[in-house]
Amino acid sequence: MTTKPIYSREWNYVREADRELMLSRHNFRKTSDFLEQILLALNDLSQQQRALEWIRDEHFSDLELEILIPIIIDIAVDGNQDRLPYAREILFNNAFNSNDIVRKKLTFMFDGFLRSEDDWIYMRLMELLCFLNYNDLRMRLIDKCKNSTDENIVDVYTSFIQNRGWL
């Protein structure tokens, strides 16, 4: 005969709170303004991380991703450094869907990032392109950095070629 484990009151509170959170998430997902609420949270720095965690953990339709991915790309390239890993994870998890939404959106936004002439953006963009293994875009960025007259931008090239060995 086995005895049933006796859990602490705190454990039972956590388990109940987790169940309630799952139910709340399920009910929220079914609301008519779900996507609008996610977009509001993505554009509010105080709620952005929670929104990114939600997007990371949920499944979204291609239509929803068409709207969300450009914002997430912008966060991954020019957002708060604490949120970069969440944004990159979302992009990576959706990079290989059947409609190739991440690649299409990033390619569309790529020239705008290049026009920024900002070494911070170039560094984050280079990291993202390596992470997603988008070699064609990465080579374009490498050429832009290598041929720049801005010493800081050339340093991005040097950092990736010499220090990280990523060509």
Predicted regions and their residues:
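Long, contiguous N-terminal structural blocks used for assembly/anchoring
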Residues: 1-75
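Eukaryotic acidic, Ser/Thr-rich intrinsically disordered low-complexity regions
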Residues: 2-14, 136-167
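Structural detector for internal amphipathic alpha-helices that build alpha-solenoid repeat scaffolds
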Residues: 12-27, 49-62, 85-98, 120-132, ...
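Amphipathic alpha-helical scaffolding segments comprising HEAT/armadillo-like alpha-solenoid repeats
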Residues: 29-39, 62-75, 97-112, 135-146, ...
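Alpha-helix N-cap/helix-start positions at coil->helix boundaries
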Residues: 45, 77-82, 115-120, 150-155
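Helix-adjacent hinge/juxtasegments
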Residues: 67-95
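Short, local alpha-helical segments
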Residues: 106-113, 118-124
